[in-house]
Amino acid sequence: MNLVLPKKQTGVWNGSNKTMGDSFMDIWIGIIGLSLGSFLNTCIYRIPRHQSIIWPRSYCTSCGRQIRSIDLVPFFSWIFLHGHCYYCRAPISCRYAVIEVLTSLTSVIVYKNENGSAAFFAGILLIGFLISIAFIDYDWHLIFDKVLLSFAFCGGIVQMFLGQTSYLNMFLGFLTGGGCLLLFMILSHGGMGGGDVKFAAVLGIWFGWQDILLILWIAFVLGGLVGILLLATGKKTRKDFVPFGPFLAFAAFFIYLYGNIILSVYQAIAYG
């Protein structure tokens, strides 16, 4: 199976031949991931508010004062400040630290998955967009076109330099991802948002038509299970909206790691 993102599945969990150099690279990639997570926090906060993600520099959302350079160290600044602004002592959500750690861990996983190849940078782009889109959709129930356009453009660039699939597969992935959710949106009379449709279409560009089907299946199953749990616990009612973007993002990262394995097992069972 040819995918847009080349995968080296054996690199994810194989630590039997780990060297000191490998450990150093893991730490270094983890630090880079923390910094990327800090940038993603900026994107997640500012993009829905139509603010520049570059200027001005980071500031406290309570008092508006610019954050000191020493307090911009990802994750550790939140720990040292005990989760409060240095100036006004307003609480800072632990989610900032969570996103930084999440990005750091997934960056290391991507590095292992790609065995340090150039495809690592494509994987970093992927998780950056997935995390940003997932949290923005969770907060605002919106997936912004400008983010999706950038995501699609990067998918095309990745395919140009690293891809192992045809442009036809990318086009079919685009049609399959967007078409399936568009059909669901029509049949469910608005049960799916337009942003989700476009998100699935762009994922199809990155993954191709076979993997986007797996992504949609996992996202629907996971979304259904979470929905049942929320209904059972009284956290949501049948009339409440649950954003689908986070489920698509999680499913996409899962298939990025294990898509080849899943399809290989399926083909072995189906065709002997």
Please give the residue ranges for each predicted region:
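C-terminal ends of transmembrane helices
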Residues: 41-46, 82-90, 130-140, 182-191, ...
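Interfacial loop-to-transmembrane junctions
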Residues: 232-252
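Functional transmembrane core segments of multi-pass inner-membrane proteins
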Residues: 29, 120-224, 264-272
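Alpha-helical membrane-inserting segments
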Residues: 40, 44, 106, 110, ...
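N-terminal signal-anchor transmembrane alpha helix
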Residues: 26-52
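Membrane-proximal soluble regions of multi-pass membrane proteins
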Residues: 42-95
